Regions:
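Extended, compositionally biased non-globular segments that define protein topology
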Residues: 2-4, 21-163, 168-210, 715
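Intrinsic-disorder-associated, low-complexity terminal segments enriched in Asp/Asn/His/Tyr and depleted
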Residues: 7-10
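Residue-identity detector for glycine
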Residues: 13-14
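Intrinsic-disorder-associated interaction segments
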Residues: 27, 31, 38-39, 51, ...
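Juxtamembrane/interfacial segments around transmembrane helices
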Residues: 132-137, 157-170, 243-258, 666-670
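Membrane-interface segments at or immediately adjacent to transmembrane helices
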Residues: 208-332
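Solvent-exposed soluble domains appended to multi-pass membrane proteins
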Residues: 309-715
């Protein structure tokens, strides 16, 4: 038997060596195994991230279409880009843990995402504004007060809510597939995934920087403005939430102040000749409408130069510079016209010009067509509805987006509030509200404005207080005896009878006055709105009657405007009252400002200047001859020659030159001419600065800082 041939490669150890081809096969198998493991570990992060990306993007688009009824290509693209890092981080949370935990976290994250977007959708449908993070901290108060109303709106919004709930059902049903078994992603991959999410966020922000076309560009909206509606519309709910948190923490970025502007020269007052009443009206009892001209400006001796020189904080230095360069409002023929009179100032819940009728509401009709008649008055809607409407009207400042401005002002020095001004002049000052005393923290803000404050639960008891809304008439019958015999009085009153919702099931005042509107040719909701506003009519009738009986009517000024338009009506329902389709950008906010005195009976002074609730406080300050600094207030005296500027929450505006629609980024001149883009950009910058520095006044207690330096600050 021939000897066995020994493999030379096997001689040393006597073992058989695996052939080269087998080694290559094993190597390929190992590579496939490693590759498969890599895919599985990355898949643990990618699969839930892709699912959440689809969920958030779908819900964001649904909200845009449901709330705004439009979707631009740019909005769709940027919403996707800014949704991607959010989805990646949530996917990391769900896929970066064990499968058992991930299958619990994925439905939970989906539910939270859907809850936040769904809540914003329903809230916007109710209040025509988006819910702020700050409001969440006060949610117990809101639920306690309007829980039934909220439940009713949720039930009425069953379709969008079901569309928001569907992804959570899918996440629960397919959780095993969406969070698959497999190797752990590992700390390194988790960090790289988070880094990729951050990179996508930075890239998206960089792309926004490139979008600078137009006046109110995407870049300007993202990096400067405080416009929740436009932010949601262009970037999505989650990006709007991020921008809001940034504003709350770091303030609103102003536009660069124009330091070259000099104070405007003293101008002739506008032509405000008394308009003769129609022949069937009673003759005027007084035609003394021309006080002696008193030259000067509404300013206080604030040394801005010293403030600027000594200020180390760049934000405050910028504020000092901007305020110092503002043109002060000149005094005019109407300065001090009402000096020494009493004042009753009413902010009426949901009041509208369209609620008035010479037959149903004769008192409101008379008051709105006599005295000062403002033909182009607007009540813009702000983010915190009634509270922000009050804040704008009573302070002449723009509320800061994302917070309860009136509540936060409670610890600030508010020297220009009429309560504090009149109290310093020896008046008895009161504030009344026929709803819960502490709602929106009014029990803190209103005393700080200089009032003895009464409301339900704090010195005011109403039999109608157990129903909603309570009765404005009953409140007026209770409160007038509290002040009418005072030597001098100044009264601020917030009504509630006109509050939503406008149905017979939910509105006690609509039920009370239903017979008066039952035959009107409108939908039930519109008739319910008109019915509940009739309670305000009766309250005003009672007020005038009690003043006249006490002999105080002739020496009392009555002011009334809305906190906001009745957003409890849909645009379609509001259009019923108008008789045509309402313009939702400007026309829907047009309203009535009543400014009437008993000695102006039968005479009207028509003012066609464009103005808004922002201008009410400085106008009253001028008429009553109060000391204030017009440079430190964002509104202006309507009766002065100051240029008009009506600012809306989305940065649309109306001025003496034309009107700007921020949604279309289009400025239209009144004279039909071609707008100058640089001039329009300067107008938008002015709006931005008024918004930003209103926020600075609130955030820094600016009045105290400035007036302490001038030796004029109070406690």
């Amino acid at each position: 038997m021939p000897p066995r041939k020994t493999d030379p490669e096997n001689r040393a150890g006597g073992t058989r060596t695996v052939p080269r081809m087998c080694m290559e096969v094993i190597s390929l198998d190992n590579e496939k195994t490693v590759s498969s493991a890599l895919r599985e570990s990355w898949g643990r992060l990618a699969v839930p991230s892709l699912f959440l990306l689809g969920v958030i993007y779908y819900e964001e688009l649904f909200l845009k279409l449901y709330c705004f009824r439009t979707l631009s290509p740019e909005s769709a693209v940027f919403t996707f880009l800014f949704t991607l890092p959010v989805a990646m981080l949530l996917g990391l949370l769900c896929g970066g843990v064990s499968p058992r935990r991930g299958r619990i976290l994925l439905p939970a994250c989906t539910a939270l995402v859907s809850l936040w977007i769904g809540t914003q959708l329903v809230y916007y449908h109710m209040f025509k504004a988006f819910l702020s993070i700050f409001s969440l901290t006060k949610m117990a108060m809101v639920v306690q007060s309007f829980g039934e109303t909220a439940v009713g709106n949720v039930l009425a919004s069953w379709f969008p809510i079901s569309m928001m709930a569907a992804p959570t059902v899918l996440a629960w049903s397919f959780r095993a597939r969406l969070v698959p078994d497999g190797p752990d992603a590992g700390g390194g991959r988790r960090l790289r995934w988070a880094a990729m999410a951050a990179a996508v966020q930075l890239i998206s922000m960089g792309l926004v920087l490139l979008c600078g076309g137009g006046v109110l560009s995407l870049r300007y909206i993202y990096y400067r403005t405080a416009t929740p509606d436009l932010e949601v519309q262009n970037f999505g709910v989650f990006t709007q939430t991020q921008l809001e948190l940034k504003r709350v923490l770091f303030g609103i970025v102003p536009d660069d102040p124009d330091v070259s502007q000099e104070p405007a020269p003293d101008m002739a007052p506008p032509d405000l000749e008394p308009t003769l009443p129609p022949p069937d009206s009673p003759p005027p009892e007084s035609d003394a409408f021309r006080p002696e001209v008193i030259p000067g400006y509404h300013t206080l001796p604030v040394d801005f130069d010293t403030l600027i020189a000594n200020e180390e904080d760049e934000g405050l230095k910028s504020a000092h510079l901007w305020f110092s360069q503002r043109s002060p409002t000149p005094e005019n023929l109407w300065t001090g016209y009402f000096e020494g009179k009493n004042l009753i100032w009413i902010v009426a819940e949901g009041f509208s010009t369209l609620a008035m009728d010479p037959q149903r509401t004769p008192t409101l009709w008379k008051l709105s067509h006599q005295g000062f008649v403002f033909d182009n008055f607007y009540t813009p809607l702000w983010g915190v509805s009634t509270s922000d409407g009050e804040y704008v009207t009573t302070t002449g400042l723009i509320p800061k987006s994302g917070v309860w401005s009136y509540s936060l002002s409670s610890d600030n020095y508010m020297p220009f509030s009429l309560g504090n001004q009149f109290r310093r002049d020896g008046y008895s000052t009161f504030a009344f509200h026929d709803y819960l005393y502490n709602y929106y923290d009014r029990d803190r803000s209103h005393p700080n404005m200089g009032y003895d404050y009464y409301a339900l639960g704090q010195g005011l008891e109403l039999e109608s207080g157990d129903n909603f809304p309570p009765s404005d008439l009953e409140m007026m019958e209770k409160i007038v005896p509290m002040f009418v015999n005072k030597d001098k009085f100044m009264v601020y009153c917030l009504t509630v009878s006109g509050h939503l919702t406008y149905t017979l099931d939910t509105n006690a005042m609509s039920v009370r006055h239903w017979d008066a509107v039952a035959d009107l040719p409108y939908s039930e909701e519109v008739r319910c709105y008109l019915a509940c506003q009739m309670e305000l009519e009766l309250a005003m009738e009672s007020l005038l009657s009690q003043l006249e009986a006490a002999g105080r009517l002739k020496d009392t000024v009555i002011v009334l405007s809305a906190d906001h338009y009745p957003y409890g009506l849909t645009d379609e329902q509001y259009s019923e009252l108008l008789g045509h389709e309402v313009d939702p950008v400007f026309e829907i906010f047009q309203n009535t400002l009543i400014l009437w005195s008993g000695d102006m009976e039968g005479t009207a002074v028509h003012v066609d200047k464009y103005c808004s609730s922002l201008d009410v406080m400085p106008t009253l300050s001028n008429l009553f001859g109060l000391d204030y600094d017009s440079r430190l207030i964002m509104g202006s005296d309507i009766l002065s020659p100051a240029d008009p500027l009506v600012i809306f929450a989305n940065y649309s505006f109306i001025n003496g030159v034309g009107y700007y629609n921020s949604i279309t980024d289009q400025f239209t001149r009144w004279d039909g001419g071609e707008p100058d883009p640089e001039e329009v950009a300067a107008m938008v910058a002015e709006v931005q600065n008024r918004v930003a520095y209103s926020g600075a006044i609130l955030d820094t207690d600016y009045y105290r800082l400035v007036l302490e330096h001038a030796g004029m600050a109070g406690p």
